[in-house]
Amino acid sequence: MRNTASARLTGRTGFMVAALVAWSLTAAAQTPAPAPGTQKPGMAPRPPLLFGETFRIPPHTGEETDENTRVTQAVVTNSNLEIKLYGADASVIRAATHEQRTDLWNGMTTSPAAVTLRDKRSLLDLTGAARLRWILRTNAIHTLHPVVKLADGRLLVGDRTITTQGEFLSVEVAFIGMRWYVLDPAKVVVRAEVVNPNLRAVDEVGVAMLMPGGGHGIAGSANMSNVELFAYPVPR
């Protein structure tokens, strides 16, 4: 009798487990998967595209050279943006064409340099899910670091390194979780660490090259092409 009752109980338990599994699978199958590109539940929403920039070759006479294609405001196509250069020899950064895009190249610089963009309409909130998306190429062992200029005027560099090993790649930079350091705007050298900087009020955003360029050919340098910033605007 006990064996029979035990067998009946085991059979009922197995049936209930099987039924629960079947119900779970059916419910999961009926739950629609999130559409590609939509936000997953519980995650902070991605900010919208605040600005984008596709650089251009500046006006010049004759064939393109290192001298007549140097970066000025004329390389910027977005009328809402200003380009800023930092470093003793940053003025020799030039525009060039690769893969049918225009990029900025630091190969001829004899000093560290930084390139940033400033939105004339608003400050930038780079907290949370804000992202900088940039098509970049680093050559040899050259690396890039994210740079921000705060509303209080301080230029900061992040400890996150960017390297693409000679390929043009679309790189996304998240600004949270980084350690930040004061960046000397004249020499582009790293100073003291800044703890918890206010990334809710950023004036400029860009990248720094903490070593000089290596010249033409397969040498240490970086190319900076199309760029997009996904962030919330902050009134100036």
Task: Identify the function of each model-found stretch.
Residues 30-236:
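Beta-rich carbohydrate-recognition modules and glycan-binding surfaces
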Residues 14-24:
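Bacterial N-terminal signal peptides
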Residues 1, 29-30:
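Initiator methionine at the very start of the polypeptide chain
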